[in-house]
């Protein structure tokens, strides 16, 4: 039905007759002619109708926004005075000879001239996706997946599918369960990741695997989370962590070059401990120059208990952030930052303005200055590299509260004061994560997942001092987003059983939930390692949006609902009976009946 896309016409098409299909983006009458902007997935081109072509001109009178049409016309170069440099097709226009109105459109429930609510956009998603910026994002997504497949294929990886209906295993979030009609009372689980299957493929000898795969997690949503999401899943045998990172870094660098024409350069490597101490985050945004600086050793003996208390506590922390030019901040704004860190458990935010670096005590302004000796003040200013016109913010509390609060403050200051270089790219690898973290109930939980191998420890050493264990894990971070994470996997049954035991999974439960894995580990399992990229987050970064719903064709809301199809919905009672499922109503629902 078409010979060209609207958005691809240029001066090379001048004089050619073309057939275009698409939608009326805008219509206007000017000087006896009818002009429309015609749109398809590739962009917009100007089309005009002349009374000399009476049949087409008469039909064009009926055109309204979003009518679906086909036109036949000749491409012409626009006069120099009419060239539109804001349009990709702005040097040309199409003189229409014939017009067919394929389908008319009622007035749209979305207004193209104003910002529509996200609720309206999701309810009428098929209309929202007609917008050029939305189409561009999905086209970029398609370009990314196509590039990834070519790269992986060229590096010897095999695209192998893994099951969608599988067994529930503890991976950190709730599973979506699917009842079995044949095996009444039993349930499949939709996979949170293909983790165990890809490890089993390594045990099967496939060596290099990848898959662009849907994953499912029933968890509370955030702006960058969805109940169903897409991973670029990768696993390798006989490769070290360093070799895996090398290949995956090459993929990221070539992807950025292909999509953005940006060379990311070599990725620096930073340990988890360094990232938390310097940036207050295990996914630091290195575009922001601000850092957390530890000063606990300098304030152990000051009379200010807010500082000296945590400074003398093995689990405490006192850290400062030096903000260049921050001495100009008003007291009102400083108080707002104090309220901000309260969100993260901090009891307050101490501050010190450096008005004149050379003037010592006389050159600073702060409610806490009276508690600091000249020597302590000088030591703090020297360590933080404070200069005249700067401000220091201090956090003092438990290590976790200070790290979380000051890390969040660092990001906010970077945005508010325009210190973060938003037009740049800052990738890195974060490595050497703790193997375990406290679960809040007196036990331990795996920081990544329970199949990650420890670095340089035997099962006996791991069982003896699990809190000292460092995981052989790595995350790829770009501009403060964790875009991919992976690890070397456990490939010996004894080590896997030890990890399960540390996590409180007894022998019976190990056999019940992971018997197939423990059995497979007995039969010559090769060393293996892998990584998974979050495709949705990659597309977010590469398209410049901060909302994951902008890069998914039909996303869910933060309440895990689809406003367009009204999913989830109630099941037919007959279907529930066939599945042997009984829906238990809440007491409040029973009372209302």
From Swiss-Prot:
Entry-linked Pfam families: GAD, tRNA-synt_2, tRNA_anti-codon
InterPro entries from the UniProt entry: Aa-tRNA-synt_II (IPR004364), aa-tRNA-synth_II (IPR006195), aa-tRNA-synth_II/BPL/LPL (IPR045864), Asp-tRNA-ligase_1 (IPR004524), Asp-tRNA-ligase_1_N (IPR047089), Asp/Asn-tRNA-synth_IIb (IPR002312), AspRS_core (IPR047090), GAD-like_sf (IPR004115)
Gene3D superfamilies (alphabetical): Bira Bifunctional Protein, Domain 2 (3.30.930.10), GAD-like domain (3.30.1360.30), Nucleic acid-binding proteins (2.40.50.140)
Keyword Transmembrane helix part of the UniProt annotation: no
UniProt-annotated stretches for the region Aspartate: 195-198
Example GO biological process: aspartyl-tRNA aminoacylation
NCBIfam families documented for this protein: aspS_bact, PRK00476.1
Subunit: Homodimer.
Name by which UniProt lists this protein: Aspartate--tRNA ligase
Organism: Serratia proteamaculans (strain 568)
Classification of source organism: Bacteria, Pseudomonadati, Pseudomonadota, Gammaproteobacteria, Enterobacterales
């Amino acid at each position: 039905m078409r010979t060209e896309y609207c958005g691809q016409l240029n001066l090379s098409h001048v004089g050619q007759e073309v057939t275009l299909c698409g939608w009326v983006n805008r219509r206007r009458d000017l000087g006896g002619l009818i002009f429309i902007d015609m749109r398809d997935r590739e962009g917009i081109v100007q089309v005009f109708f002349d009374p000399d072509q009476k049949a087409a001109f008469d039909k064009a009178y009926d055109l309204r926004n979003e009518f679906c049409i086909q036109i036949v016309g000749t491409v012409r170069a626009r006069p120099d005075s009419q060239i539109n440099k804001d349009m990709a097709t702005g040097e040309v226009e199409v003189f229409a000879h014939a017009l067919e109105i394929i389908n008319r459109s009622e007035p749209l429930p979305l207004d193209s001239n104003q910002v529509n609510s996200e609720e309206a956009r999701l309810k009428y998603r098929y209309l929202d996706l007609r917008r050029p910026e939305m189409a561009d994002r999905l086209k970029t997504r398609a370009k990314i997946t196509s590039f990834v497949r070519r790269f992986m294929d060229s590096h010897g990886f095999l695209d192998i599918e893994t099951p969608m209906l599988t067994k529930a295993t503890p991976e950190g979030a709730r599973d979506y369960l699917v009842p079995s009609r044949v095996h009444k009372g039993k349930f499949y689980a939709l996979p949170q990741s293909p983790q165990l299957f890809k490890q089993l493929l390594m045990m099967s000898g496939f060596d290099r695997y990848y898959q662009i795969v849907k994953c499912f997690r029933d968890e509370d949503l955030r702006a960058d989370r969805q109940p169903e999401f897409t991973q670029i899943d990768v696993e390798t045998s006989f490769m070290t962590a360093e070799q895996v990172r090398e290949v995956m870094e090459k993929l990221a660098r070539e992807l950025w070059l292909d999509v953005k024409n940006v060379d990311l350069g070599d990725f620096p490597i930073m340990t988890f401990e360094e990232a938390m101490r310097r940036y207050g985050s295990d996914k630091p945004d290195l575009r922001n120059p601000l850092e957390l600086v530890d000063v606990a050793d300098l304030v152990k003996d000051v009379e200010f208990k807010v500082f000296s208390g945590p400074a003398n506590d093995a689990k405490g922390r006192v850290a400062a952030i030096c903000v260049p030019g921050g001495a100009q901040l008003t007291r009102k704004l400083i108080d707002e930052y104090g309220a901000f860190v309260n969100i993260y458990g901090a009891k307050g935010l101490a501050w010190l303005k450096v008005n004149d670096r050379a003037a010592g005590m006389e050159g600073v302004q702060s409610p806490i200055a009276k508690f600091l000796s000249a020597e302590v003040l000088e030591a703090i200013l020297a360590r933080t590299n404070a200069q005249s016109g700067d401000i220091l913010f201090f956090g003092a509390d438990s290590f976790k509260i200070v790290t979380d609060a000051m890390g969040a403050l660092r990001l906010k200051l970077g945005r508010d004061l325009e210190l973060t270089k938003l037009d740049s790219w800052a990738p890195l690898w974060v490595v050497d994560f703790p193997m375990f973290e406290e679960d809040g109930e007196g036990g331990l939980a795996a920081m990544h997942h329970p199949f990650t191998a420890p670095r340089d420890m035997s099962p006996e050493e791991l069982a003896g001092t699990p809190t000292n264990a460092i995981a052989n894990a790595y995350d790829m971070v770009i501009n403060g987003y964790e875009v991919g994470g992976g690890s070397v996997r456990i490939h010996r049954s004894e080590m896997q059983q030890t990890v399960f035991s540390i996590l409180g999974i007894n022998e019976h439960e190990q056999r019940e939930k992971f018997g197939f894995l423990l059995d497979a580990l007995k039969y010559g399992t090769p060393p293996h390692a892998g990584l998974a990229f979050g495709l949705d987050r990659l597309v977010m970064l590469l398209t410049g949006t901060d909302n994951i719903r902008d890069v998914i064709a039909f996303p869910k809301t933060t309440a895990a609902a689809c406003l367009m199809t009204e999913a989830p919905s109630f099941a037919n009672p007959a279907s529930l009976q066939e599945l042997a499922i009984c829906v238990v109503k809440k007491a409040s629902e029973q009372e209302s009946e």
